[in-house]
Amino acid sequence: MTQLSGSSDVPDLGRRQFLNLLWVGTAAGTALGGLYPVIKYFIPPSSGGAGGGVIAKDALGNDIIVSDYLQTHTAGDRSLAQGLKGDPTYVVVEGDNTISSYGINAICTHLGCVVPWNTAENKFMCPCHGSQYDETGKVVRGPAPLSLALVHAEVTEDDKISFTDWTETDFRTDEAPWWA
């Protein structure tokens, strides 16, 4: 084979070298293509809101659409959604049929049970050891030592609920939040 360059110190690319490079490139492309789904599996899906929050999800894992949600939930209703860090979080419907500006983390501060909302008694009652919380999640009867944690709940532009961390003063106790 003749060289295309005028310099004798530039080796030419032989047919064998070209086929070897082609084979290595094909093998590398196939390997990378096979690794793509494996790598994608380990990266969590982005479900965040604009401000670093988490979009609330229902029991089936679907995003909660506020307009649909308010058609099936009335004022004073509290229902569970998947919130920050995957914790069950109550979405609160206000008296004027809007979503409250806060959500209530449903994890009991005593031993970590999920605390259900008792509509008949208008309070949260822990089934594990009897702790009770008022409608805002403030502890009213032990053995739980602290009130339920709060999160900010905001309706996004695309009509979904975004939960973000609550770092301000706890409006129920006028103290710094213990969970922040």
From Swiss-Prot:
Intrachain S-S bonds: C113-C128
EC number of this enzyme: 7.1.1.6
Membrane topology: Single-pass membrane protein
Signal peptide (from-to): none
Cofactor(s) of this protein: [2Fe-2S] cluster
One Pfam family this sequence matches: Rieske
Further remarks about this protein from its record: The Rieske iron-sulfur protein is a high potential 2Fe-2S protein.
Function summary: Component of the cytochrome b6-f complex, which mediates electron transfer between photosystem II (PSII) and photosystem I (PSI), cyclic electron flow around PSI, and state transitions.
Name by which UniProt lists this protein: Cytochrome b6-f complex iron-sulfur subunit
Taxonomic path: Bacteria, Bacillati, Cyanobacteriota, Cyanophyceae, Oscillatoriophycideae
